[in-house]
């Protein structure tokens, strides 16, 4: 059985250097790292990860908790986190909280029990008091798309209210005055903030907000379909819809075409998130950029800096949304 001593002899480096390479320590030159990895490959050496973990008090694993495993938004986020961590020699364990308080708590407990060195969490159902209580845990937790003032240095968040404001203001700038809104679930803080931004834009421009033209739905295509169905049945006039996310927008666009509406001439639509399919819809969806890839990378960099003591560039904790202008809004000016 090959030992670390044989790897050290073949690579002509110290045992400490071999250990640093196996632990992903950045204080090893690329040339030395390649020598050690080549020696390990030649000898067929596989590190005993359990023993390594016990010796270093590190598992080199990071937990990720997201509301859902499926879907373009969280897929992008998880991919960004995993890519950044894998490049540093770390692995991830992923579990889902399904936007349910008990399942989110269970997910965090599971990741802690798996001896993850840190956790990156996108939680929606647990309250701020629970999150504050996690500060006592020895496992550091980074929160994406959640802001808790007392834990600001562990939070990475987006100004969702501003995003909702920009979305509706964009419709207004194109001459739309009768604007409907399909919001996400009002149990979710980002959905609440986006709806608040929509209302602020309407109020600032002196436009009427009709309850019959606001619908609370799931952050899924079905939310968009049901929302547009409700608006059409209300017989209220509207020329545009501000959608809580791109999946809602996609559902609304599908329902509109199925019922003979031409986009954007008969109905203008704006989304939120700028997920990968937004530019492939017809017409191409005008939307609000939610920099989920960058936020995922930032979360991973925070873990590498704070847990693994790897030097990183300055960390950005708060992101501003931006408009991605495409083809789904008709100009009525």
Residue ranges and their predicted role:
Residues 1-59, 333:
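N-terminal helix-turn-helix DNA-binding module of bacterial transcription factors
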Residues 167-207, 212, 315-329:
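An alpha-beta-alpha
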